[in-house]
């Protein structure tokens, strides 16, 4: 069994050693909750990695969106190359939930596009938890949705070893039972094929490696792993576990028992609807449910089988669903990253789901058991936590109230200070801001501006463009990929000014930014709360020459608190730097808190340097292309898809230029 072991040239510095010791001690003392209060750029991820190494517990890291989850996953893969680091997020590229609108008598069928790659990663995550303890799973909030019973998942897993007395047809029957399909032509993930005495399987947790079971009569003679694309043998296996192709797979016995319970619930519900004189609803429910029962009986599943998950799991009505958290051992450790944003998301999930299901049940589209196919309530989520570390630069009241220990991480390894904050009047703010933009851009830096409305962001962008400023805006209407493209352009210098609303808070760490301007800073509310202001100020904490300008006519309580907190941190940082002779420096290369897509400015420099070096050393272009292709495959394997895309473009350029 592997142990967590960090591979890094860095050692904990600044506040990191103290924070690590404090939190590890608290966890070892059995405390349930603790908080890591770490400022932007202080190396919170590295601190988390050190805590994992010291405590040696299976770990779940909860992030508030897919982009940050992917970024964290890539970072932890670098820190723990010899351990298992998995990515678990919603597998829907597109999702339209089942719904009914009574006012217009409109039923909307469930419509979804499932991302096969992410589904594979989800299976890889649950498989890893069954097999090992040195597992880190980085997940989005979707991990609190029902996933199927882990006990049933374990029970249905097929365990095979060379020398076992197993009939080939018996193994095939078991594969079909756990929802694998036979396909001798289109051999893909979750399928198997039969060639003589050989049974080839592509497990649900992989798409590039297959398992070949070689039989000799009724005995397993040999188990080999092979490359699905080339067919080449990779190696021999002494044991293999084939996990179900669906997290909702169930044994024949469980399905038969479940069908009887569904039929009983249907009978009870039809009596209720008939008594209420809802004849149409009763007929609709009977027809839809009987169709589902027939599908389950014949195929082992039906469309929307998750709506019967409570019955399949054998749970009582109203009890919480089984989720990813139930796949972890009891002593697992959880980190909630950016907890001030993530926890409110967890709280909101249940209410939205419940309101949609109510009309489906009332109007005969679903049985009441559909209510129990839901995300966890916040109280249920809390009950499943063993030990947790809340991670945030601005933890909320909940985190502080539920923490025995709060470890501050204020010193940055780079020596960078929290920025200077200036307050200027709102009168003439745009003209003043234009002058500041010009001075900042002339020094080769970038500007972030935060407004209160989308309209203002768009109008200000147009105004600045008319003055020949390279400006663009970013708000919630802009999707993730477009957002990453904008950040890339900002880092490259194709854009000098980025204007946004609350999107300029968490996860936008750009070292080139030397000015953050907060317009209408004295308009008290969600976008100008103490937490929002501190997070926005943090965007200027990556550059040694940065500053923040708040345009306001009054100093609100939130402004006062955020300014005082920033000044408090700044004093601590200055004293530490003075004591240890540290000069604050802007570090662009090697800063790991940057979203992978934004590293393009570094990559462009690196690429140009590589080409120059190759030319000097007379390295053939073909050799350079080969090196980049290997790096591209490795980046894709490590979920660094934007990096892989950049390398693909570089390879394309090299091929065109070498013609």
UniProtKB/Swiss-Prot annotation:
Its main location: cytoplasm. Coiled coil: none annotated. It is found in: Cytoplasm. ATP binds at residues 38-45. GO terms for cellular component: cytoplasm; excinuclease repair complex. Residues 429-582 form the Helicase C-terminal domain. The keyword Signal does not apply. Forms a heterotetramer with UvrA during the search for lesions. Interacts with UvrC in an incision complex. The beta-hairpin motif is involved in DNA binding. This is UvrABC system protein B.
């Amino acid at each position: 069994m592997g142990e967590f072991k960090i591979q890094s040239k860095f050692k904990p510095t600044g506040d990191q050693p103290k924070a690590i010791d404090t939190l590890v001690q608290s966890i070892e003392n059995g405390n349930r909750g603790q908080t890591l209060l770490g400022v932007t750029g202080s190396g919170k991820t590295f601190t988390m990695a050190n805590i994992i190494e010291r405590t040696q517990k299976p770990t779940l890291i909860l992030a508030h969106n897919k982009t940050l989850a992917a970024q964290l996953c890539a970072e932890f893969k670098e820190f723990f190359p010899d351990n298992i680091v998995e990515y678990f997020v919603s597998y829907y590229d597109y999702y339209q939930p089942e719904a009914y609108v009574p006012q217009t008598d409109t039923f909307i069928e469930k419509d979804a596009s499932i991302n096969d790659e992410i589904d594979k990663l989800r299976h890889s995550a649950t498989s890893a938890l069954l097999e090992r303890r040195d597992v880190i799973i980085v997940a989005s909030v979707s991990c609190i949705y029902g996933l199927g019973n882990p006990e049933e998942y374990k029970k249905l897993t097929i365990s095979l070893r060379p020398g076992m007395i197993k009939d080939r047809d018996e193994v095939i029957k078991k594969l079909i039972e756990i929802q694998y399909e036979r396909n001798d032509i289109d051999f893909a993930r979750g399928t198997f094929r039969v060639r003589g005495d050989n049974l080839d399987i592509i497990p649900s947790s992989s798409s590039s490696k297959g398992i070949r079971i070689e039989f000799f009569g009724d005995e397993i003679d040999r188990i080999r792993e092979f490359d699905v694309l080339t067919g080449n043998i990779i190696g021999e296996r002494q044991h293999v576990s084939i996990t179900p192709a669906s997290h909702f797979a169930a044994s024949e016995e469980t399905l038969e028992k479940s069908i009887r319970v569904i039929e009983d619930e249907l009978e009870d519900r039809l009596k209720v609807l008939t008594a209420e004189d809802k004849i149409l609803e009763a007929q609709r429910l009977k027809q839809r449910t009987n169709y589902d029962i027939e599908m389950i009986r014949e195929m082992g599943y039906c469309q929307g089988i998750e709506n019967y998950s409570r019955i399949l799991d054998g749970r009582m009505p109203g009890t919480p669903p089984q989720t990813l958290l139930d796949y972890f051992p009891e002593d697992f450790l959880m980190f909630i990253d950016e907890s001030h944003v993530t926890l409110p998301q967890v709280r909101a999930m249940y209410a939205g789901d419940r309101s949609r299901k109510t009309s489906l049940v009332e109007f005969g589209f679903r049985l009441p058991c559909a209510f129990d196919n839901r995300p966890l309530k916040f109280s249920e989520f809390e009950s499943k936590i063993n030990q947790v570390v809340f991670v945030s630069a601005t933890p909320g009241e909940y985190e502080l109230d539920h923490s025995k220990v709060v470890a501050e991480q204020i010193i940055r390894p780079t020596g960078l200070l929290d920025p200077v904050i200036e307050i200027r009047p709102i009168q003439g703010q745009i003209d003043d801001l234009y002058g500041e933009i010009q001075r900042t851009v002339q020094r080769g830096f970038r500007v972030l501006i935060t407004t209160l409305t989308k309209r203002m962001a768009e109008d200000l962008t147009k105004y600045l463009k008319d003055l020949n400023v390279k400006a663009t805006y970013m708000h919630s209407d802009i999707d993730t990929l477009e957002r990453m493209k904008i950040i890339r352009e900002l880092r490259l210098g194709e854009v000098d000014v980025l204007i946004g609303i609350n999107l300029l808070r968490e996860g936008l760490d750009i070292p080139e930014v030397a000015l953050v301007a907060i317009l209408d800073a004295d308009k008290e509310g969600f976008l100008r709360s103490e937490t929002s202001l501190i997070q926005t100020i943090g965007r200027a904490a990556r550059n040694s020459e940065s500053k923040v300008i708040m345009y306001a006519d009054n100093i609100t309580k939130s402004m006062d608190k955020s300014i005082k907190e920033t000044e408090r941190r700044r004093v601590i940082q200055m004293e530490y730097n003075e004591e240890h002779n540290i000069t604050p420096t802007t570090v662009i290369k090697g800063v790991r808190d940057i979203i992978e897509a934004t590293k393009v400015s570094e990559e462009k420099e690196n690429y140009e340097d590589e080409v120059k070096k190759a030319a000097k050393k007379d390295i053939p272009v073909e050799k350079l292309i080969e090196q980049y292709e290997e790096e591209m495959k490795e980046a894709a394997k490590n979920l660094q898809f934007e990096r892989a895309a950049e390398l693909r473009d570089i390879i394309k350029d090299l091929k065109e230029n070498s013609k």
